[in-house]
Amino acid sequence: MLYLIAEQLGFPGVLNLIRYITFRAGAAALTALFIGLIIGPRFIGWLRIRQGKGQPIRADGPQTHLSKVGTPTMGGLMILISVMLSLLLWMDLGNRYVWACIGVTLGFGLIGFMDDYDKVKKRSTKGVSGKARLLGEFLIAGLASWLIVSGNGTQLYVPFYNGPVIDLGPFYVVFAAFVIVAFGNAVNLTDGLDGLAIMPVVIASLAFFVIAYLVGNAKFAQYLGIPHVPGAGDLTILTAAIIGGGLAFLWFNAPPAAVFMGDTGSLALGGALGVISVVAHHEIVLAIVGGLFVMETISVILQVFFYKRTGKRIFRMAPIHHHFEQLGWSEPTVVIRFWIISFVLALAGLATLKLR
């Protein structure tokens, strides 16, 4: 909004700063951070009153989790409010990529909200059916992918290789939708401990802040041999807002958590990262940067597959963060070590930009 106003005025005086993506990104991060910190206490109090007993806790989970009974969920709404208000202020709302990303983020957030609401209402750990959720997610992701692809090409790029490896043509829409849905659910699976999911989301957003900026700059893209996507630079503002809103949420989600983000937040944030990677043509790099989320997802797939085939479990409990809890690791130990893994993987993902 401010960008369009300043543009109409010709960027006079101090408003010339708004012309620069880096300035707007920094402002977006701070705006989301302060909004989250300001609304947090009252919002959490309101959730606690409305939900009563809070998020249902799995009876078959680690016994230490029973102390979390009564903690409200749907804290992802707090993140979405702070991020969206920040975006409305600082993003170029004339950029269609912006609306594709906002659509996925809010759409996935709505599906997550419906799931959280169902769980709280039924006092059950099972919400909306998996098939209904996936159908809604693929419809949203498919529409966004079609909007992106219509002016962004259908080439697939992979790390360590200069230039596209294949043109997927119309199948790119299916591939892109799969990436968005898969990553949304991967973040959702990871959100099982206080602070576990949100910090890796912040770290991945920081990595894609760099990637989106480089992809959106013709000179940097040519120098690094990565795809140049005009307009993608504005997605740095979205990643910055997620960083700010995520850190504000972590203030209240740090152990012992005062609120859980729920599916409302995890699906929305995972979907946002997925669609950003599609716009930037760095979908494979997302699997490296967000490798922690991939690891959590694979642990669940392997657990289910081997249990159905052999009747035995590979892990004591899945997702894998619960396995380490069952081995005797304390919750903060699991969380911090997984943060470290996430940071290392983000650095590895960024390194692929130069190694070609």
From Swiss-Prot:
Give the matching CDD domains: GT_MraY
Looking up InterPro entries in the UniProt record yields:
Glycosyl_transferase_4 (IPR000715), PNAcMuramoyl-5peptid_Trfase (IPR003524), PNAcMuramoyl-5peptid_Trfase_CS (IPR018480)
Which class of enzymes does this protein belong to?
A: transferase
* A GO molecular-function annotation: UDP-N-acetylmuramoyl-L-alanyl-D-glutamyl-meso-2,6-diaminopimelyl-D-alanyl-D-alanine:undecaprenyl-phosphate transferase activity
Q: What is its EC number?
A: 2.7.8.13
The pathway this protein participates in, as annotated, is:
Cell wall biogenesis; peptidoglycan biosynthesis
Q: Write out the transmembrane intervals.
A: 27-47, 74-94, 97-117, 134-154, 163-183, 195-215, 220-240, 241-261, 262-282, 284-304, 333-353
Question: Which cofactors are reported in the record for this sequence?
Answer: Mg(2+)
The protein's UniProt keywords, in alphabetical order, are: Cell cycle, Cell division, Cell inner membrane, Cell membrane, Cell shape, Cell wall biogenesis/degradation, Magnesium, Membrane, Metal-binding, Peptidoglycan synthesis, Transferase, Transmembrane, Transmembrane helix
Question: Topology relative to the membrane, per the entry?
Answer: Multi-pass membrane protein
Is Disulfide bond among the key words of this record? Answer: no
Record flagged with keyword Signal: no
Q: Catalyzes what?
A: UDP-N-acetyl-alpha-D-muramoyl-L-alanyl-gamma-D-glutamyl-meso-2,6-diaminopimeloyl-D-alanyl-D-alanine + di-trans,octa-cis-undecaprenyl phosphate = di-trans,octa-cis-undecaprenyl diphospho-N-acetyl-alpha-D-muramoyl-L-alanyl-D-glutamyl-meso-2,6-diaminopimeloyl-D-alanyl-D-alanine + UMP
One Pfam family it belongs to = Glycos_transf_4
Cell location: Cell inner membrane
**Any one GO cellular component localisation term in the record:** plasma membrane
Residues in coiled coil: none
PANTHER family, A to Z:
PHOSPHO-N-ACETYLMURAMOYL-PENTAPEPTIDE-TRANSFERASE, PHOSPHO-N-ACETYLMURAMOYL-PENTAPEPTIDE-TRANSFERASE HOMOLOG
The protein's job, in short, is: Catalyzes the initial step of the lipid cycle reactions in the biosynthesis of the cell wall peptidoglycan: transfers peptidoglycan precursor phospho-MurNAc-pentapeptide from UDP-MurNAc-pentapeptide onto the lipid carrier undecaprenyl phosphate, yielding undecaprenyl-pyrophosphoryl-MurNAc-pentapeptide, known as lipid I.
Q: What family does this chain come from, according to its entry?
A: Belongs to the glycosyltransferase 4 family. MraY subfamily.
Q: What is this protein called?
A: Phospho-N-acetylmuramoyl-pentapeptide-transferase
Which organism was this protein described from? Rhizorhabdus wittichii (strain DSM 6014 / CCUG 31198 / JCM 15750 / NBRC 105917 / EY 4224 / RW1)
This protein's gene is called mraY
